[in-house]
């Protein structure tokens, strides 16, 4: 204010002015105000020096030291902010910068005294605002340079990763969404690209895994990224090196990658190696964080909190990705469209405002279209960059192969000439010194001369396939001829042909064929070497053949010895059994022989009589004998077995009729022969014999059927027919002691006949009369089958019932036999046909 007033005075002061007095008064007034202001400033400066002097005195240092310490504070605060932004440990920053501040003020307590005595709330606010403004400006600058840094990375790396700056920005955003900071992900991504990780890799997963691992372990990012770069060059070798350095992959994973690479699947091998490495780093990160102590975990959380705060500040200047721009444009258009739809029909809105709303909507729509176009262009750029990176990688690979192959195809003279021309051109253009030229040219000449001194390799002689096949067949022929001669010279059972003897013949035949082949063609190096060692090979084979023959003979002798020992054991046990069975029955002697056979079999197998296995077998055999003895005492089982055999024989209609027909045809043939030779035949005996066999067959079947029916119907005494039984009528009641026939037996005998049996009459006469003689049959055949029913009880009533049942059986049997004979003698029957053929 004082300077402005004096300046105005200098400009406006004019001696000739009519208002000189007024101006002079004005000057005096301004000078007075200037003096007062100067006095106030001097007083304030004096008070400030007093405060500084007091603060310095409280801190125990001089005013000069105090002023120097205060001047260092802004620099200390700047270092703190920079280190926090760089992701360093907050505790380490506190120890480092706090120690410097403490040393500046002479200790911890003097530091706080000095700060409390000099820093007022206003100064704190102004300082905080200044620091915040500076940090905000720094964050904006860092964020705005993100795309520029990404572009520099892609250009300097040749963009072998096949990415764009926008794609890198999106990948960093993905890492930020996954819990990392933008700087962590972008730094890991940048180092991976610089390390040479090629296109097609999963940069999002890899960059996040690297960022997490380096943050938890403290390993430099560039070191981990370099390990990924080795995978791009050679997946198997790179994975082995990574396992040796970080121990994050297993041998099985390395073997899988190697198998893919050997099969020619380079892309699959690289992808598998990247996946194995990423999974390994993630597992190690989790293990490190899970094993942190309480203090270490708290420090790690605080460090990540500072990083997140600084990362949020850096977001101020960072550009948006194409997708984020589209999302924001869509939100802006949606909002503008909603406002337009809300206001376009509002009668309180004038035309100017309505036009403004429409313009806002159209502007938002155009911005959305532009954002979508930019997103499409970004996607196209990403795809094109990926294709170009892959193509460039292949071109470089094949160029390196071509260069290596070209060097291999050059002759020694061509290499020397090219080197000489290169050196001459460099010398002519002044790009090489004469001394260096002489040394390089002499080295090239010596290398050329050394190649001339090397002996030329003669091409290896290869035996044609046809010659090899002929030699093999000839060797087999000679071998078989030798084997045939040995077999023809066989004189005794001790002649042997061991496997080693056959190998000797094979070697002899092989050498014979080689010697014959040497006369007609050039032998290969292998064949010459084999032929040179003929004597040694054959002598060794001859020795082996003799040993082999001895082994075969000894094996045969051992087998004979074993057979002899087994025979001695068998005869010894058989002799002992024979001696012990003297005076025994045939059955007991047979059992003793079986026990002796069991024992000699066990001994010949290598066991002894006291073995538990043999004792178990002997007990099982004796248990079988005991069961046989038990069955011999069971007469009922014997009777049942006999009846079962009888029933089985009677039910074999096929076998019985076959035997009957065979006997009949034989009898007819014999009678015919007798008629032709002697003029007469005994047809009566033949017919009688035939009828007797037929009667036996019918009688067997009748008895089996009758007994089966009777055994299922035992129990009636004085009962009667139970009736057929209607729908609601019971079929009768059976009382105790009654005999009940089955339905089939009742139908076969007849209800009327059964009633007549109960009364004493039946077909054929009175049942209870003075006995029924044998039924007479045609041709003089008599059938007599008496039936007796045994009853163990002495009850008279039951005895009478048994007599009646026996008579009923006899009547049924007689009727069945007579009916069968009657059918046989009728026209068409067996007997009728046999007798009428004469």
Swiss-Prot record:
Q: Where is this region: Disordered?
A: 378-397
Source superkingdom? Viruses
Q: Name one GO biological process term.
A: viral tail assembly
What keywords appear on the UniProt entry? Coiled coil, Viral genome ejection through host cell envelope, Viral long flexible tail ejection system, Viral penetration into host cytoplasm, Viral release from host cell, Viral tail assembly, Viral tail protein, Virion, Virus entry into host cell
Q: Which residues form a coiled coil?
A: 399-419
Location of the protein in the cell: Virion
Statement: the UniProt record of this protein carries the keyword Coiled coil: yes
**Record-linked InterPro entries:** GpH_LAMBDA (IPR043680), Phage_tape_meas_C (IPR006431), Phage_tape_measure_N (IPR009628)
Gene Ontology CC terms, in alphabetical order: virus tail
Here the segments flagged for biased composition (Basic and acidic residues) are 380-397
Q: Identify the main location.
A: virion
Role played: Serves as a ruler that controls the length of tail by stopping the tail tube polymerization and is probably released from the tail shaft during infection to facilitate DNA translocation into the host cell. Assembles into a multimeric linear form probably arranged as a coil of alpha-helices and stabilized by the covering tail assembly proteins. Its C-terminus fixes the tail tip complex, thereby forming the tail assembly initiator complex. Tail tube proteins polymerize around the tape measure protein, displacing the tail assembly proteins.
Q: How does it assemble?
A: Interacts with the tail initiator complex presumably through its C-terminus domain. Interacts with the tail assembly proteins.
Its family?
A: Belongs to the Lambdavirus tape measure protein family.
Q: What is this protein called?
A: Tape measure protein
């Amino acid at each position: 204010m004082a300077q402005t007033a004096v300046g105005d005075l200098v400009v406006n002061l004019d001696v000739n002015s009519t208002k000189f007095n007024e101006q002079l008064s004005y000057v005096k007034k301004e000078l007075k105000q200037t003096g007062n202001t100067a006095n106030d400033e001097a007083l304030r400066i004096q008070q400030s020096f007093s405060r500084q002097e007091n603060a310095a005195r409280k801190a125990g240092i001089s005013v000069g030291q105090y002023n120097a310490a205060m001047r260092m504070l802004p620099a200390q605060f700047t270092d703190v902010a920079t280190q926090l932004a760089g992701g360093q440990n907050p505790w380490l920053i506190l120890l480092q910068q706090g120690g410097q501040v403490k040393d500046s003020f002479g200790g911890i307590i003097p530091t706080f005294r000095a700060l409390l005595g000099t820093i007022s709330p206003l100064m704190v606010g102004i300082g905080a605002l200044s620091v915040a403004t500076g940090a905000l400006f720094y964050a904006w600058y860092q964020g705005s340079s993100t795309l520029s840094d990404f572009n520099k990375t892609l250009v300097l790396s040749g963009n072998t990763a096949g990415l764009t700056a926008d794609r890198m920005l999106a990948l960093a955003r993905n890492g930020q969404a996954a819990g990392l900071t933008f700087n962590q992900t972008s730094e890991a991504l940048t180092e991976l690209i610089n390390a040479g990780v090629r296109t097609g890799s999963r940069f999002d997963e890899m960059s996040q895994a690297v960022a997490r691992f380096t943050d938890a372990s403290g390993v430099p990012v560039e070191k981990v990224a370099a390990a990924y770069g080795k995978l791009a060059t050679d997946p198997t070798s790179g994975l082995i090196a990574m396992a040796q350095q970080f121990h994050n992959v297993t041998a099985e994973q390395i073997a899988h990658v190697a198998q893919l690479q050997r099969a020619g699947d380079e892309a699959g091998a690289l992808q598998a190696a990247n996946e194995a490495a990423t999974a390994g780093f993630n597992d190690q990160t989790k293990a490190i964080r899970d094993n942190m102590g309480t203090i270490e975990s708290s420090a790690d959380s605080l460090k990540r909190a500072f990083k997140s705060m600084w990362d949020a500040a850096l977001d101020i200047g960072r550009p948006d990705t194409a997708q984020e721009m589209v999302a924001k444009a869509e939100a802006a258009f949606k909002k503008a469209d909603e406002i337009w739809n809300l206001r376009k029909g509002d009668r309180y809105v004038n035309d100017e405002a309505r036009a403004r709303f429409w313009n806002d909507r159209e502007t938002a729509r155009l911005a959305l279209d532009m954002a979508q176009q930019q997103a499409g262009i970004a996607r196209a750029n990403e795809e094109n960059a990926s294709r170009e990176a892959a193509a460039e990688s292949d071109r470089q690979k094949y160029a390196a192969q071509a260069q290596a192959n070209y060097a291999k195809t050059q002759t020694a003279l061509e290499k020397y000439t090219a080197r000489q021309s290169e050196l001459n051109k460099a010398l002519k253009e002044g790009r090489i010194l004469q001394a260096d030229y002489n040394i390089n040219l002499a080295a090239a000449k010596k290398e050329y001369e050394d190649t001339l001194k090397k002996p030329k390799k003669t091409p290896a002689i290869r035996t044609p396939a046809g010659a090899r096949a002929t030699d093999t067949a000839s060797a087999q022929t000679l071998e078989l001829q030798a084997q045939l001669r040995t077999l023809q010279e066989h004189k005794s059972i001790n002649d042997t042909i061991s496997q080693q003897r056959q190998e000797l013949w094979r070697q002899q035949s092989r050498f014979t064929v080689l010697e014959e082949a040497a006369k007609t063609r050039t032998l290969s190096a292998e064949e010459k070497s084999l032929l040179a060692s003929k004597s040694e090979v054959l002598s060794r084979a001859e020795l082996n053949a003799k040993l082999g023959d001895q082994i075969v003979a000894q094996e045969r002798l051992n087998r004979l010895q074993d057979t002899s020992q087994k025979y001695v054991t068998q005869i010894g046990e058989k002799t002992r059994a024979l001696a012990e069975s003297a005076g025994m029955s045939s059955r007991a002697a047979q059992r003793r022989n079986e026990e002796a056979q069991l024992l000699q079999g066990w001994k010949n197998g290598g066991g002894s009589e006291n073995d538990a296995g043999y004792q178990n077998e002997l007990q099982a055999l004796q248990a079988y004998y005991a069961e046989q003895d038990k069955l011999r005492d069971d007469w009922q089982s014997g009777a049942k077995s006999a009846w079962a055999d009888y029933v089985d024989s009677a039910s074999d209609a096929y076998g019985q009729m076959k035997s009957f027909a065979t006997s009949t045809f034989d009898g007819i043939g014999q009678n015919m022969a007798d008629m032709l030779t002697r003029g007469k035949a005994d047809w009566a005996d033949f017919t009688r014999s035939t009828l007797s066999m037929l009667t036996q067959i019918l009688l067997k079947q009748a008895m089996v059927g009758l007994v089966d029916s009777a055994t299922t119907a035992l129990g009636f005494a004085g009962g009667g027919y139970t009736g057929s039984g209607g729908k609601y009528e019971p079929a009768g009641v059976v009382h105790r002691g009654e005999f009940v026939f089955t339905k089939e037996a009742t139908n076969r005998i007849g209800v009327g006949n059964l009633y007549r049996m109960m009364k004493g009459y039946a077909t054929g006469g009175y049942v209870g009369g003075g006995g029924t003689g044998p039924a007479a049959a045609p041709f003089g055949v008599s059938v007599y089958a008496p039936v007796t029913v045994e009853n163990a009880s002495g009850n008279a009533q039951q005895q009478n019932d048994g007599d009646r049942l026996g008579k009923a059986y006899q009547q049924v049997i007689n009727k069945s036999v007579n009916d069968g004979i009657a059918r046989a003698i009728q026209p068409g029957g067996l007997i009728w046909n046999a007798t009428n053929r004469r």
